[in-house]
């Protein structure tokens, strides 16, 4: 059973793990609470929504490469762990974020605190936008993107997206193609 809440009673953190299209519906609820928010989203739009409407001082972001695959309705299977980075939108890691990162590590997830979390959001966006449409169009799981004919397409998309991020001044922390 899931307990639905409509009021937040002074939590230490709000962990926002919903689909990006649901974030807009939560803005008012989040704005009326003073707790910091850890957003577990892939994508730049949500980052911009939260920082513009709530403020950078309360927003932290988690970017992860932990993989899973849907194996049935309401069921997923773990496919491997990759990177997990967290950082505050303000660019300064507060003691509360350091404490949260320790808690995440204690749960068995490798977690690194970073200063420029937006660059990691961009990294993840480039990775997802390179892989997901090709896998969906070809109707294959991500592992099958290693096939030369599909890998070539993924590579081209990744290089194009990386070039765009560079053109607009995003300093990517890692090379996206090497992370794919």
Kindly label every feature range from the protein language model.
Residues 1-75:
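Rossmann-like NAD(P)(H) cofactor-binding subdomain of soluble oxidoreductases
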Residues 33, 53-58, 74-174:
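Internal alpha-helical scaffold of NAD(P)-dependent oxidoreductase catalytic cores
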Residues 66, 119, 180:
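Positions that flank functional sites
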Residues 174-180:
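Short catalytic/ligand-gating loop segments at beta-alpha or beta-beta junctions
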